[in-house]
């Protein structure tokens, strides 16, 4: 299978080249020139596969590695998860399920891809005879940074730099990154928000002077953000996996449609679900759940994407985003794979901060949007715990709220999988506050209190943080990112 760019239809490269490059030279994102299609018989057979074997099957249909290679990568990656089934599906009531994506080493859904990406990237570099070290440049709104750091820690032939908004992540997220171990890692806070960090990363990828300067240090750039196809493609797997779990439980029959409600910021997670539907998975609706930074919710309601609005720091910081990079891939797909259409919209976004697409393109895609404010989110955490004895994190609570609103508006009783993207222990003060109605500003105290009232085991990745030494506390201006990157690993 070959890949092209969302902005230049003449681009033709392999999957391994797309993974090494990260982003196309024209600024576009790599997309497959075609997608594998699975029949209902295929999908029924998938239910009997382990997570590793299902991932091997699906990734083999996208990437230019052998099945044995991919199987080895998957076994190594997913052996780091604390549950054998990697992404458990919990039944909540007659029509609601929780897909738990937070059982990896950093307790966030990003682990599903970022435990695997180092294997894919190093193999891709070798396959394409890359002599330089690969410098992975990452912008994070909280979870990607730690997952990428942990994934690439001391991986031979790689170095990694993570940029996070200094005042835009939770205390646990920040501490996870600032205490990161490894000789090939660097972490910088920036004075700005996630969009500023992401803009800096994208600009560096297109800056010939920066690329040349890094080449003098024997580095070639790549990315671990979901702009990299190697980050996005593993996420398709858990949509098929969760459908198989509902089949195995006997709660649906093959061919029955289900919904997914997905907390959305950069649009990567829900885009993987959209691609799964495109590949044959029986999906009725994808519910795109936003917090008060509701740029995506508004887009799916009106067809207008407008980042010209106030930016809010919320208790669901991984969704505090106004420029959703993966939406570019969605535009490419719904426009009939038209790079001119994408270029027009991306130019409008860069110059005016907004663009509009025909609403019928959104209707055909089967995605609906909604949002939850802070009070809604806290109420969802409280009510869900009261009803089901299940502590939601602050992002999954947004997805639950938007799903409940969708059901109230439509009466749709289709079985729905809510995608749970993080452990509640990554946001302990807000989760504890929502459940107990008591304020606790100290994160470690909140963790202990949350454990006492919920009975949910404190993950080792959290409990060991209290004794870890802070290694990275540098904060740079958003206009000084280039110097930070150039000097991070200078000998």
Protein language model features and the residues they cover:
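PLP-dependent amino-acid enzyme catalytic core
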Residues: 1-491
